Amino acid sequence: MNVRTIADLGPDERAAFFDRDAGVDAVRDDVRDIVSQVHEEGDVALRRFAEEFDDVSVGNIDITDAAERAYEEIDDDVREAIEDAAANIRAFHERQVPEDWRDDFEGRELGRRFRPLDSAGVYAPGGTAAYPSSALMGVIPAKVAGVEHVAVATPPAEEVNPVTLAAIHVAGADAVYQVGGAQAIAALAYGTETVSATDIVVGPGNRWVTAAKAEVRGDVAIDFLAGPSEVMVVADGDADPELVAADLIAQAEHDENASVVAVTDDADLAEQVVDAVDEQADGREREAVIRAALDNDTSGVLLARSMSEAVLFAEEYAAEHLSIQAADDESLLERIPSAGSVFLGPYSPVAAGDYATGTNHVLPTGGNARVTGGLSVDTFVRSTTVQRLSEDSLGDIADTITTLAEAEGLDAHAESVRKRFE
């Protein structure tokens, strides 16, 4: 990782930062085949893929009972941490629950009604690292929304990570299945002999998971298509380079394809961050993953000519995680509307939101924060508009309705209004 100047970036260098994608094209055909086999063969396909991809011979696909046992068996301090994080996540998401309303609009009674989806499927990743926190982030908003049946799929293993299972139990999931990857998404979307089909499938995962979500979208709802983790730190000259570096390293350890970027208008800070990143990466448990992420074309320390240029770059980037470590952080925040989740000040590490502040860490990547937000109660709620008109209030707008209907050539629409006054 080295310092590059924004103004000096060539077209290809600049495009690397903004043309981030989930990398699904390379696996799309294989994923389509996996999804098709699960759809057609059910549990047989799930067991076959567990052998092929996870090197595991799966007995019971449904391991719901194992989640409760894991909760009892894990270390007390880990159990307490899970419960504390869950309480914070639940409290934050309870503030999001929408309320039905009806109002009078010149005699027309109009309103909105909110109802939860009937079922939801949550993917809790495994692979190179287990993510019990993702189980909390996916299940809790669904249960807060009132979803009756929430199922979790997590990759199979000789022993599925007990901390992940305990987190699934604490979150309140109704069913747990040991199935991973694209085949898990297909199972949650279409159902098998063991796995119940759900109305929506949510949760982060690798490019196979993301490609599968793209494949089933249309037959089932999804949250969004997420790619590798990313963070952008916008910092002024007063920022602590050690803290900036720590936040970059923390996201880099997720995935060798992660994107980690710092932007500053202070040349000294930029060089200090580069040095601090190199020092802090040394000796970390996932150092190889970290250094691979740091070497990506989508990672770097960028020097801006001014904070205004830094802000413009950050807004165009639309980071999954945006950390603002600057004296006027609130002012800068107002100028960067596009970000999945924002962390203000030196004592708001991105890791806090990843685990325990209560906000959700399932967030849009690849610039999609320009048009959508992260996982929330809204993800699991459907809204319906409601209207009741009296004879008088319908009469007030009858001419408007009939005139517009006839202008569109839909005379039956117009007649359906006139009939009420015959």
From Swiss-Prot:
Detail which positions bind substrate. Answer: 229, 251, 254, 321, 354, 408, 413
Superkingdom is Archaea
One GO cellular component, as annotated: cytoplasm
What keywords appear on the UniProt entry? Amino-acid biosynthesis, Histidine biosynthesis, Metal-binding, NAD, Oxidoreductase, Zinc
Q: Which GO terms describe its biological process?
A: L-histidine biosynthetic process
Sites binding Zn(2+) sit at 251, 254, 354, 413
> For this protein, what is the EC number?
1.1.1.23
The UniProt entry, under InterPro entries, shows:
Ald_DH/histidinol_DH, Histidinol_DH_CS, Histidinol_DH_monofunct, Hstdl_DH
Which co-factor is required? Zn(2+)
- Pathway, according to UniProt? Amino-acid biosynthesis; L-histidine biosynthesis; L-histidine from 5-phospho-alpha-D-ribose 1-diphosphate: step 9/9
Reactions that this protein is recorded to catalyse:
L-histidinol + 2 NAD(+) + H2O = L-histidine + 2 NADH + 3 H(+)
**Which Gene Ontology terms cover its molecular function?**
histidinol dehydrogenase activity; NAD binding; zinc ion binding
Active site (catalytic residues): 320-321
Any note on cofactor binding?
Answer: Binds 1 zinc ion per subunit.
Positions bound to NAD(+): 123, 183, 206
Looking up Pfam families in the UniProt record yields: Histidinol_dh
Q: Tell me yes or no: is Metal-binding among this UniProt entry's keywords.
A: yes
Explain the purpose of this protein.
Catalyzes the sequential NAD-dependent oxidations of L-histidinol to L-histidinaldehyde and then to L-histidine.
Family designation: Belongs to the histidinol dehydrogenase family.
Q: Which PANTHER family match?
A: HISTIDINE BIOSYNTHESIS TRIFUNCTIONAL PROTEIN (PTHR21256:SF2), HISTIDINOL DEHYDROGENASE HDH (PTHR21256)
Full protein name: Histidinol dehydrogenase
Give the source species.
Haloarcula marismortui (strain ATCC 43049 / DSM 3752 / JCM 8966 / VKM B-1809)
